[in-house]
Amino acid sequence: MLEFDDIQHLVLTRVPAITGRYEFLSFRQPSQGRAWLAGIIDKVASAQAVRDGVDSERRWVSVAFTWPGLRALGVDEASLATFPEEFRQGMAARSQVLGDTGVNHPDRWIGGLARPDLHAIAILFARNAQERQRVTGEHAAYLARTPGVDVLSTLDLDAIPPFDYAQIGRVHV
């Protein structure tokens, strides 16, 4: 049986977000990455929380990690070895298999997303532009108080009419 309160909402639900931002992060030291995670984990919405409060919530936070990001957090080698080879290789190394060639080659990815020091993505979704500004501002203030976590790049997202939700899919890193 699935424990919906232990699964991030992004895996199982779609929120009524019409805007958002992906913030691509790098950790200088394991302790700094863990400190960032410890401070944001309570803001990450579970699938159960979204099911219970989707109508009243205005914004949603998720996090995703790359395999190098898990290593950068200090996850032990035995645990890292349990992940599928495809995840360990990463998207840039698998670009041929994924069809990311030519103009879509990792060397052309905007924001340096093929960099080996891409460790995590903070996924900040909001119901409207005002809430996006609020959630991104809060995360920026949090990052300013959390040394050793660098923003490599960001990607702002907005709904495309006539849809009433942002075309924000799952993040695969």
Regions found by a protein language model. Give the residues of each.
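Long, low-complexity, Ser/Thr/Gly/Pro-rich intrinsically disordered segments that act as flexible linkers
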Residues: 1-170
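Calmodulin-binding IQ motif helices
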Residues: 173
